[in-house]
Amino acid sequence: MNSLVRRSAQQLSLWRTYCIKHNASEAASPGRNAGRPNYEEFIGRHQRQAQCSIVVQVSSEKSYEELYNYCSSFGSIMGAHHYCVRQDETLHYILLEYATSDEAAAAIGAGVTNGELSGVPVRSPFLWFRAAGGGRRSPKLVANTAPALLSLDGTRQVDQRHLLGLLRGAADIEEQVQQLYEHTRLNELGIRMRFLAALQVQQAIAGMFPAAQAQPFGSSVNGFGRMGCDLDLILRFDSDMGAKIPLEAAVPSRLVYHTKENLSNGRSQTQRHMECFGDMLHLFLPGVCHVRRILQARVPIIKYHHEHLDLEVDLSMSNLTGFYMSELLYMFGEMDPRVRPLTFTIRRWAQTCGLTNPSPGRWISNFSLTCLVMFFLQQLRQPILPTIGALAKAAEPGDSRVTEDGINCTFTRNVDRLGFRSRNQSSLSELLLQFFEFYSQFDFHNRAISLNEGKPLSKPDHSAMYIVNPLEQLLNVSKNVSLEECERLRIEVRNAAWVLESEVENASVPEGDGQELSCGLLNLFKHPEKAVIRPNMFFKPRMVEVSDLFEQKEAGATSSSTPPTPAITYKSASVRQQVQSIKAATRSELKQLRGSGSSVPTSSPNNRRRSR
């Protein structure tokens, strides 16, 4: 009993030391967003956590106590998370975080290769826990009572029925929006797993490229990611991630590395690098499978699936603007606690009514929707968010960021220097209704949306929807949106405004006798067939069958000699024979025309009529 108490006290002391160390490192930069998390600190904290972590495959969550006792011999375990990967069978994994990276490295170094498999032996933070008795002698273990798992099946997404039940039990729309956000956003375990995937890529090339960095960006780190979202990675061989380093800050040296000269075409060089790196991922990295190289895209990427993390990963080497855009969105999300819940609700609404689609195409994307939300929050009488132009004007010399392509991504990283304070006190339900009302009246036909200026601009081209790219201002992030989809968006926001306004006036309305009440957001999240207005009546299908066109032409060719008849069904045998003879004569004349090269066949009946 006394040993258990001493062990618990030791764990508590280590945890207190760990927290003090991490909090001190985050507070080391004075004057940087006091009281508000900084993006660089957020990234750095999770990178350190990844360096202190390992992922071990186990038979079930019941193996945790045995795994804890075994792995405690390498260092102090600060926390453990359990998650499942559901494929043909359910696979169980436990993520262990040590107090230091050296302890995690000791656990990884104690691993052995699987002699039963013929794969290339690779050292990585992904291991599996085999049954006792096999392999080399286990270290001497001290029986300890393992602390409870911090999460059990921690990556399981909430199902639709359970989510609707939570929303139905909420007191009002405000609580519904918060419930939706809390139960669908990317949780802490999901973020940790994504940084582990990045660390695996970085460590794979650390021998040849010690300054290389693989950093997550996009929805995984900007605070707007949902459970199950893909991971976007950028791999850079330099450590500054595009930042300008003053020459006077560099330490002079007379020793210079020999390097390989690149091709004159930078894009071709990047494609060759990525092709080579894709082969390495496919052949050597544990867990990486289904590698696809998409090198001809505007931003060349490598897509792959990580089977131990159940992640879809997009790896690029030249998307620095996407990296800095993630930082900008993270700052917007941290400025006001209403920004992210409002964005999640609007994204969910768009998904429910079919405005967004998982596949790329003519539909509006989640990023474009997020830009619409940010622009709306800039347009309020009492704005909740500042303009990007104001952030750029408040930038200091240390905030300078310029990509290799010369794109200026400079804006202040210290929001407190901006002096922006929002006095807007609107509730989430009020903001949601105002969003729908704002875009139901917005002139998409003539006006463009600019987060940099914070006001509508004249459209520079005839795109159905024009949203100025916040960092590459010559580009339109919604260029893919078709005219039909833009009109659908206007109709759907009008529907939503009408439904939500009715819901505000009537707290809840029964759907029918014997049915549960459907109120608040549930009315917005109804299936499309229950919506008030559908835009399908305004647009005809644009897909046609080519064979039908030829049948119509052939049927129309007989209109001069016979009454109009269907192209396929013939009620008279003589008519069928006449049509067949006309087809045969036409084919013969076409052959003669191709053979002689003349422009008009002389035997054509139409020509004989003209000569008369």
From Swiss-Prot:
InterPro entries: MTPAP-like_central, NT_sf, PAP_assoc. Its cofactor is Mg(2+); Mn(2+). GO terms for biological process: mitochondrial mRNA 3'-end processing; mitochondrial mRNA polyadenylation; RNA 3'-end processing; tRNA stabilization. It is found in: Mitochondrion. It is an enzyme of class 2 (transferase). Disruption phenotype: Mutant male larvae die at the third instar larval stage with a severe reduction in polyadenylation and increased mitochondrial tRNA levels except for tRNA(Cys) which shows a marked reduction and an accumulation of shortened RNAs. Mutant male larvae show de novo translation of some peptides, suggesting that polyadenylation is not required for translation. They also show reduced assembly and activity of respiratory chain complexes I and V. Heterozygous females are viable and fertile as the gene is X-linked. Its EC number is 2.7.7.19. GO terms for molecular function: ATP binding; metal ion binding; poly(A) RNA polymerase activity; RNA binding. The keyword Transcription does not apply. The keyword Hydrolase does not apply. One of its GO terms (cellular component) is mitochondrion. ATP binds at Y83, C84, V85, R86, Q87, D88, E89, G228, C229. It catalyses: RNA(n) + ATP = RNA(n)-3'-adenine ribonucleotide + diphosphate. This is Poly(A) RNA polymerase, mitochondrial. It comes from Drosophila melanogaster (Fruit fly).
